[in-house]
Amino acid sequence: MDFLIIGGDTRNLKLADILIQNGHTVQTMALGEEYSPSLQAPYVIGPMPFTTDGVMLNAPLAKQPVKLNDFTDITKQCKMIIAGKIPKQLRQHFEEQGILVYDYLDYEEINIYNCIPTAEGAIEIAMNTLPITLHGSSALVIGYGRIGKILANKLKLLDVNTVVLCRKNTDHALCEANGLDSIFPYELESNIQKMDVIFNTAPAPVLDSHKLSKIKKDCVVIDLASAPGGCDFAYGKEAGIKIIHALSLPGKVAPVTCANILYKVIAHIIEERS
């Protein structure tokens, strides 16, 4: 099969290699080479996320920026587009052109697999930033969704005194079943000052200026939530608090693993259509 991979990060570079190794023909654009709008292929693979600002294609490795309009021009002749977090209007536009559109985020297995490098990347950041070992330290994990569950379990295995903040009674029961301490949101203020590191996974403003004013001087806050995150970054900067907004960790810490995950999903999509 003939693929054209446009934009994206190191994951898409590695994905190109995997596709070639599996006998496919692959062209790439906006992955370090010169922009070439004449390239065409029936199967187009875009980045994940598709765009970060709604104007430009997410293409951090491109030699020159690629506008979303340029992407739509390139893909006029294609049969299928596969990418992640495609804006609703763009998806509708492609479908009106008769193009089959598949979004990675519609495939739960990708979301689950990506939690592993996200958790490992967050732990790596903590290890490189904290002035103490994670072993024996106190960590707060805010949120007990997919990422929160995997992260909390990995921290526990590193002998970190891990506390999970969650809302649902069922999540508190799961924490207890997994040997984890947990608190409710109303208990955050009385516990936050005990923490050496705080990991936020909740896409909500949970760490406002009042909460941040309570943390220890050397505490590190690692925000894993999608933009705009869950912290008052302006206050944190003003107060000298170390807050790291760690986005797109899978592609940064484990691009080969992530590329293999994407390949499995792409192969599944194409097999379904054949």
Q: Where in this protein do the model-derived segments appear?
A:
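Residues in the short beta-alpha loop(s) of Rossmann-like NAD(P)-binding domains
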Residues: D9, G32, P87, R167-N169, ...
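NAD(P)-binding Rossmann-fold cofactor-contacting core
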Residues: N22-Y35, L158-N178
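Glycine/serine-rich phosphate-binding loop and adjoining beta1-alpha1 elements at the start
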Residues: I45-H135, A246, V265, E272
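Phosphate-coordination loops involved in phosphoryl transfer and adenosine-cofactor binding
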Residues: M1-D2, C78, H135-S138, D218
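Rossmann-like adenosine-cofactor binding region
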Residues: P49, V66-T75, C175-P250
